[in-house]
Amino acid sequence: DMTPRHLAEAAKRAGRKAGFRVKILDERAIKKLGMGGVLGVAKGSAEKPRFIILEYLKGAKAQKPLVLVGKGVTFDTGGLNLKPEHGIYEMHMDMSGGAAVIHGMAAIARLKLPINLVGLIPAVENMPSGSSYRPGDVLKTMSGKTIEVLNTDAEGRVILSDALYYGTKYKPGLMIDFATLTGAAHVALGNYASALFYNREKLAPKLVEVGRRSGDYVWPLPLWDEYLPEIKGTFGDLANIGKGDRYGGAIHGAKFL
């Protein structure tokens, strides 16, 4: 029975055991920050959102932190764009990105590595109800950018947009997000590799090699500017899915972020 509150409590327990700091923002604090993406996706659920902040700052003061951002959708029905029967039963795992960040933080803290590390997890449920966000809604995110919602089942990128922007306040040397985003990535690469998107050419081969050594494979997909017009919004800055056809869905999600 995993909800945003339970995920936040699990993060606290991990922090106490491993030795990193945990701060939890409730719905009121999330509203104060203007995280319209997180609030929009969470609207349909009786479970209130949480924004989980993990800090392990054991490096030099001058060292820019590594910021890890994990998708924390504790159950994803698809919202009003409801998922089909065959795809919905395992959607308790849509918080895997957030879980990866918590466990990564715990491993690094236990190893007592001399680095500065921050973890950020927007935690929500995406549920259908009379109060759910709807196709056609326009959400204003923390960055000030607006999102035109074309499909409520493309919610991961909506909440991650707020988390990534929040992460910039740490002035990171590097920011990496982890997410079950998207089904199209699964179609492209099957069961044995995750899609890797990057805006640093030199970093990609290193991540591919780390994946090869660990057995947790990643493979690069393009992030070219040619895809940008396909996610331009009509009534908002960006649409949360590509317009026109279903091709390139994984790339649209990454380009959106």
How does the language model describe each region?
Residues 8-257:
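A generic structural signal for tightly packed, nonpolar segments enriched in small/aliphatic residues
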Residues 1-7:
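Short beta-strand to alpha-helix junction loop
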